[in-house]
Amino acid sequence: GGETNKGITRAVYDSYRKMRGRPSQSVKFISEEEVRAIYKFQYWDRVQGDLLPTGVDYAVFDFAVNSGVGRASKYLQAVVGVAQDGIIGARTVAAVTNPIATINALCDRRMGFLRNLRTFLTFGRGWARRVQGVRAHALEMAT
């Protein structure tokens, strides 16, 4: 939570800058280059985006940016019926046998998670639009 820009929290941004010997600064000043690097290192690589089927990769990545890598990974694992350890590996990737069904089930579960948050009444419409857009784009990518 807290200060966020493009799904990147101040804490994630500060950690990224510290690892590169840079001083912390408000996430509102994040550059596009930093956004791309953080998305790749902090989210895409950690959900094994390069190994997941097209479309599923995007749906899991976007979920990870907004709700954390662990949650996105465990929800994917639940959807495809493997142990939910939060680490996407060969078993998880191999279990994604139907990308369309996986995308739909993952987006449904994501919405279920969001609906149960106490801030859903405030932010729910925006979250629902985002998930709807992610679903549509992921399904288009998968076909």
Language model features: what each stretch is:
Residues G1-T143:
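Cell-wall polysaccharide-cleaving catalytic domain and substrate-binding groove, primarily
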